[in-house]
Amino acid sequence: MTWFIDRRLNGKNKSTVNRQRFLRRYKAQIKQSISEAINKRSVTDVDSGESVSIPTDDISEPMFHQGRGGLRHRVHPGNDHFIQNDRIERPQGGGGGGSGSGQGQASQDGEGQDEFVFQISKDEYLDLLFEDLALPNLKKNQHRQLNEYKTHRAGFTSNGVPANISVVRSLQNSLARRTAMTAGKRRELHALETELETISHSEPAQLLEEERLRREIAELRAKIERVPFIDTFDLRYKNYEKRPEPSSQAVMFCLMDVSGSMDQATKDMAKRFYILLYLFLSRTYKNVEVVYIRHHTQAKEVDEHEFFYSQETGGTIVSSALKLMDEVVKERYDPGQWNIYAAQASDGDNWADDSPLCHEILAKKLLPVVRYYSYIEITRRAHQTLWREYEHLQAKFDNFAMQHIRDQEDIYPVFRELFQKQSANQSA
């Protein structure tokens, strides 16, 4: 009788390889579902997992079947209603003959399948959410290091997933183990076989001694055969480790308008944008510094919690935030050693005489030293003087980008538009 002993340490993850293959195969449908789900989430749970639904038709597998046309006779088991040459009516369009949202009318016939729904983890969700995104114009200033990691081979390990198994190394270990476990028995077997051959040719015949030797030889051979050809102890997997790669250090300035003209819905959309930005930076680049600046009539550098949740408000003077950013850059972040980025969110409402000053500060002080400056305007109203001043900057500076957000659904597409990974030709 054969016995199978499951000694896998990661038995509960035995379908990991199949899961990864499924995520790769249906990446387009999963990313579409994620982009729709991100707009339905609250600010606090944007980095948790997600239930993803895929239409059943999209996950159908290819199969071999009879071609159309020709004459064929078929026997369908369980048929007690129809005979040959009967015409079967098509189910009515309103019936349940397919997947749907459940908003149609009821039907007494027809059948279909619901959409396929499965759960992805937090890490899988964030990987897909920020795929193909990067900080634009990142350069290696002074060869200062930022811990950006790349995967490298690092020998072998005794644990892993089946996709990483090393067949050659596992068989080498199997051979070494079987040699070590059976070496003594094989020497003893060789000695008994030599003794048996000597006795079998001697006179007079020693039948009892021959029978004893044959039994011992059979027992030794059985013991040798019971040593398994391969054991979990022999298995070796290719090991990979993440090593820091020489890269550049970066700082991201987050500027947000919290004036009285920003209603709660607009502030929530700005918070969503910056939370996406924070998750992206903290996940992609381990040592990126983030500077948070809130402003109304006065600007103030704050920590992360105060930036997102403080209730302080007031009038609107955007230039106060730009002046404070310029001061912080001069004090702490030398442009020759740091890649400086900035993202500004506002509803576009600003004191009219202040907008030309914003244009001047950006054109003369900030844009010459930053790698990339992005401005998002969150409003359903017509653009005002600040937007028009910034349009002149966009025409003059390649490192300045601006986008308009009207509704919550625009946040994620705009975020991807601003931080889309550049090709080699574009970055050059």
Curated annotation (Swiss-Prot):
Residues 78-111 are annotated as: Disordered. InterPro entries: UPF0229. Residues 78-90 have a biased composition (Basic and acidic residues). Pfam families: DUF444. It comes from the Bacteria. Residues 92-103 have a biased composition (Gly residues). Belongs to the UPF0229 family. PANTHER family: UPF0229 PROTEIN YEAH. This is UPF0229 protein YeaH. It comes from Salmonella paratyphi C (strain RKS4594). The lineage of its organism: Bacteria, Pseudomonadati, Pseudomonadota, Gammaproteobacteria, Enterobacterales.
